């Protein structure tokens, strides 16, 4: 009886250690990400003023990009999120069962379908940017930003899929770490570029951010799935 009790205690301690090993790093990186994200939003209008915009115009342009155009670009990614979260338990189950072949097959299909979906929407958004801006905002002020930012849809959606697959494959810490690194890179770009090229600095930062995030996640997925399996 004592040996069984000791074994149960050891199992509980081992389980607790595993939980702490996962949750503590994720909690720390989550806090860092939240703080960096707030700082990023704070410096954009300040740097636009440094570029030469009056404060009111700086806030206005910031609002057009981040508050109006960018949320439109985010809609396809939000649609993807509604089912991509279901990939976490699915891939966790496949990993536990050692079903490597099915993991690879599903990954390939998901990336192909997501790419087709994203590229189709990019074409629609770019072609109908004026109509979208008029319908939603009753002006054309955001149409150029919608058109310029539309290609980001592809990287956002693919990154969403890659991140949730990685979480299912017990790589949630890596996902959070890449998000923190991404924010640091974005802040550096915003800090140094906006005072020299204004709005262009924001556009470049958004592109670098999304491309880096997807590339890092995909390379991690490649190492975890395609290379090792």
Task: Please annotate each region the language model reported.
Residues 18-34, 67-70, 74, 114, ...:
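Residue-level signature of transmembrane alpha-helical cores of multipass secondary-active transporters
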Residues 125, 174-199, 209-220:
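Alpha-helical transmembrane segments of multi-pass membrane transporters
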Residues 31-76, 93, 133-137:
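Helix-terminus/linker motif at the lipid-water interface of multi-pass membrane proteins
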Residues 1-9, 41, 163, 192, ...:
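C-terminal transmembrane helix end/exit motif
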Residues 16-20, 66, 99-116, 120-128, ...:
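Interfacial transmembrane-helix starts/ends
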């Amino acid at each position: 009886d004592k040996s069984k009790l000791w074994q149960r205690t050891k199992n509980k301690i081992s389980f607790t250690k595993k939980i702490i090993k996962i949750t503590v790093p994720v909690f720390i990186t989550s806090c860092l990400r939240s703080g960096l994200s707030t700082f990023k939003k704070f410096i954009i209008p300040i740097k636009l003023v440094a570029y030469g915009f009056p404060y009111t115009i700086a806030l206005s342009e910031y609002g057009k990009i981040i508050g109006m155009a960018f949320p439109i670009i985010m809609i396809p990614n939000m649609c993807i999120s509604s089912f991509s979260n279901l990939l976490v338990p699915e891939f966790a189950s496949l990993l536990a069962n050692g079903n490597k072949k099915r993991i690879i097959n599903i990954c390939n299909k998901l990336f192909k379908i997501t790419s087709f979906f994203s590229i189709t929407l990019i074409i629609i958004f770019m072609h109908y940017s004026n109509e979208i801006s008029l319908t939603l905002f009753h002006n054309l002020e955001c149409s150029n930003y919608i058109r310029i930012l539309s290609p980001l849809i592809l990287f956002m959606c693919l990154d969403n899929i890659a991140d949730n697959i990685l979480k299912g494959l017990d790589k949630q810490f890596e996902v959070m770490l890449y998000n923190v690194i991404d924010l640091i890179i974005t802040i550096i770009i915003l800090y140094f570029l906006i005072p020299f090229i204004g709005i262009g600095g924001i556009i470049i930062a958004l592109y670098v951010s999304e491309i880096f995030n997807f590339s890092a996640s995909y390379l991690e997925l490649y190492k975890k799935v395609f290379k090792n399996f």
